């Protein structure tokens, strides 16, 4: 186990260090000046115009609210630590000047920068940090995501300790690199609930502050005297003087806005439009650019069809397998996606955490205690889903599906699949967006060949949230990619505790003691190899129970952007970060911007 002290790093006399890693040596020493993937001399200036998918309706906390916080809000706050984007699990102090982990790994203490202050000039102290944790832990989301915290203790004005229920894990560090954002106690103490819906932009401390907004846009301005601007973790980042998000709820309208130059940047989710919608004169002149970015931070299925196993209809593993066999991925890939998509055959597809082939010796050792509790095929067969020729000829898979349904007690009668009581096999796909219908409709046609009747119900966002929280659905399409390493998200996607809590990702209702044990094993692993083995075994156990139908593997981010920006030479190193964070590495190039503006004005 390697904790913080690495080649070139030095601990201070009191044991505090500049960074921490539980899985590998830190790349950057205590005297590092900036991350390798930035341009430390990037000029400041200009405006970046991005897009948002929802109206500006809320500026407060995102904990336990059904309304999305305004796009870009996270840049107005500071975090205790941040994750280096060119390391798997390297974390460095941001608001925290120093980090100390106790010998038993159950107390994590932070020393705050004495110079840190909020945008109103008030210093950031331990009281603000404790207040932020207390507020988060009082919410439903916080109780779930932060349940590993035993207590938060103020030592003095600049020192605060987080006492843990168990040993510190990489999952804990990864979460701390995102949450909680540090809130000002002096601002909130007389304002009440930090989670209340509000259109009053709150006080922050980050590199940007709220400037102005309306229902259809929000604009942020760079804080000239941002206290953390010269920190090594921030040099070369946050270069735009202003960042503006325009709200576009319809993808067709968004694409048109990009082509007209109303937006600087768009992540194209549809491979068909990527191929055919941007062959414009501006693209041919090199002004409107297309680029695929391959990220290592996400893996697994980008999407999966989820069946609610809490419902009797989907509680039988044979039924779930039959439903998986009826899905013809290859036909959809050919017909809709130009054959560009790769099917996910693992919950961690595209990473070293994915199971492949038959289990090896280390996996077998971990599996052995559960031999009588998992499907026998976990030991004897590599997991595969049937592949077709892409032209709708999946007769063999449907025949196998029919056999499984028969053994599960279903039979065909007058073209309908019925149980012993004569009840038809009928269920509903709940969809929040019309564009998902083209995934579901061909699948419904395949199910009809088995005598199964499936329908679609489109719902608006508020109703969708309510139905998700109350588990009132049969099936739907869920985003299912996981960060790397995936251990932070495992409890929320797969643990039985999450199956009964409304604000989690365990929408399939997975409740399996073997799965729980494997998740806990992965989280307590003390080496990267132990995490890999635990995840591979977990992968096999989950796959062979058919809770989901994995769809396409996580794909490269397909960027459409105007050639107005400078970019770091080593930007490609930053593969362990959310795709939208690349914007924080770019800068406005005056000459390039003038060229684009001139071309747009001519049009």
Regions found by a protein language model. Name each.
Residues 11-104, 111, 134, 203:
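N-terminal lobe/hinge region of extracytoplasmic solute-binding protein
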Residues 77-89, 177-242, 249-253, 260, ...:
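Gly/Pro-rich hinge or "lid" segments in bacterial periplasmic/extracellular proteins
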Residues 111, 144-190, 205-214, 357-373:
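Surface-exposed binding/hinge segments that line
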